[in-house]
């Protein structure tokens, strides 16, 4: 007598950029009668296709992909809004008896979707004062203040990322607690299996360089030029996306196109390291090799992990 198929659960496919998350997500959705829910913060933006490595309709293999192309490039990203949308979609899929396959490398977005994470509110006066100070003094001065108030946040947030520095300082002022104290523990709101795709740094760096080359060949500069006409340069979040920020600088004459291309590779490698560090801190992530030598085994190993009767 065969056992009944497992009841649908949430699967989160996580890890650094260029590790192979998207293809694994499609495979799992095909095998489990699931649908993909995007957890890449920049794939939420309409028209940002080449530079975010968004799967083409053909590459999606007939699998519905949710939360792609939902915001204009002028809209500032909101993890709280993403959380609302992602949970509504996850709840709907589970109610239909389908497996939600959350795919992406934006760590806070993954946590927002599946974990007990509440977002502190905002205070327009505090935000305006901090943004004015950012404009006058620059991000370095505010980052030094953040590092003194919350060393862990100072380490995690780049000294050049004025938007995130302002938000962290705003949360500290509103709550009276360190910014990192407002991040959740490892309390899931869903029965979730988290799969991390692991690729050794030398191989991942090579993949990133090749991916950036393919993006340029596919017309990233033209994509950015078209989005600039739609307000990309004024978009607080979208204009900072890897590749887009560098091409915007080239279009403004601040660097050459070759320099923008090289900086995109460097910045993406740095970003991949931060992504990897973020997910390594979560003991719930089951890591599987996504190395080229193991690619044929990865899908089946992931499927076996998901179909275990007991999750960790």
From Swiss-Prot:
What cofactor does this protein call for? Mg(2+)
What's the top EC group for this one? transferase
Record field: catalytic activity: adenosine(37) in tRNA + dimethylallyl diphosphate = N(6)-dimethylallyladenosine(37) in tRNA + diphosphate
EC code: 2.5.1.75
List residue numbers at the site (Interaction with substrate tRNA).
106, 127
Q: Which is one GO molecular function term here?
A: tRNA dimethylallyltransferase activity
Superkingdom of the source? Bacteria
Annotated SUPFAM superfamilies: P-loop containing nucleoside triphosphate hydrolases
Q: Where are the transmembrane segments?
A: none
Q: Where is this region: Interaction with substrate tRNA?
A: 40-43
| Disulphide-bonded residues | none
Cite the binding residues for ATP: 15-22
Keyword match Methyltransferase: no
Where is substrate annotated to bind? 17-22
Task: Please provide the record's keywords in A-Z order.
Answer: ATP-binding, Magnesium, Nucleotide-binding, Transferase, tRNA processing
A single Gene Ontology biological process assigned to it is: tRNA modification
Describe its assembly: Monomer.
Biological role: Catalyzes the transfer of a dimethylallyl group onto the adenine at position 37 in tRNAs that read codons beginning with uridine, leading to the formation of N6-(dimethylallyl)adenosine (i(6)A).
- Say which family it is in: Belongs to the IPP transferase family.
Indicate what this protein is called per its UniProt record: tRNA dimethylallyltransferase
State the organism of origin.
Streptomyces avermitilis (strain ATCC 31267 / DSM 46492 / JCM 5070 / NBRC 14893 / NCIMB 12804 / NRRL 8165 / MA-4680)
What is the taxonomic lineage of the source species?
A: Bacteria, Bacillati, Actinomycetota, Actinomycetes, Kitasatosporales
């Amino acid at each position: 007598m065969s056992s009944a198929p497992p009841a649908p659960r949430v699967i989160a496919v996580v890890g650094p950029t260029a590790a192979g998350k998207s293809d694994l997500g499609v495979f799992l959705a095909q095998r489990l009668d699931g649908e993909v829910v995007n957890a890449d913060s920049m794939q939420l933006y309409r028209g940002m296709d080449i530079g975010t490595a968004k799967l083409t309709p053909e590459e999606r293999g007939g699998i519905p992909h949710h939360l792609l192309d939902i915001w204009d490039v002028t809209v500032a990203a909101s993890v709280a809004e993403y959380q609302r949308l992602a949970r509504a979609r996850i709840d709907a899929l589970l109610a239909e008896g389908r497996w939600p396959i959350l795919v992406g490398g934006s760590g806070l977005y993954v946590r927002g979707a599946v974990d007990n994470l509440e977002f502190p509110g905002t205070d327009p006066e505090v935000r305006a004062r901090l943004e004015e100070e950012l404009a006058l003094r620059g991000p370095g001065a505010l980052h030094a203040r953040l590092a003194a108030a919350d060393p862990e946040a100072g380490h995690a947030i780049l000294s050049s990322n004025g938007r995130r520095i302002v938000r962290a300082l705003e949360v500290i002022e509103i709550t009276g607690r360190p910014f990192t104290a407002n991040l959740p523990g490892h309390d899931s709101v869903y029965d979730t299996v988290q799969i991390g795709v692991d690729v050794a740094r030398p191989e991942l760096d090579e993949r990133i360089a090749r991916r950036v080359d393919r993006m340029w060949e596919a017309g990233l500069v033209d994509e950015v030029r078209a989005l600039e006409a739609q307000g990309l340069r004024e978009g607080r979040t979208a204009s900072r996306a890897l590749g887009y920020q560098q091409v915007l600088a080239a279009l403004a004459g601040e660097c050459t196109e070759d320099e923008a291309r090289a900086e995109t590779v460097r910045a993406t490698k740095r970003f991949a390291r931060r992504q990897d560090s973020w997910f390594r801190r979560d003991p719930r992530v089951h890591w599987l090799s996504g190395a080229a030598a193991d690619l044929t085994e990865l899908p089946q190993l992931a499927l076996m992990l998901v179909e275990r009767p007991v999750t960790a």
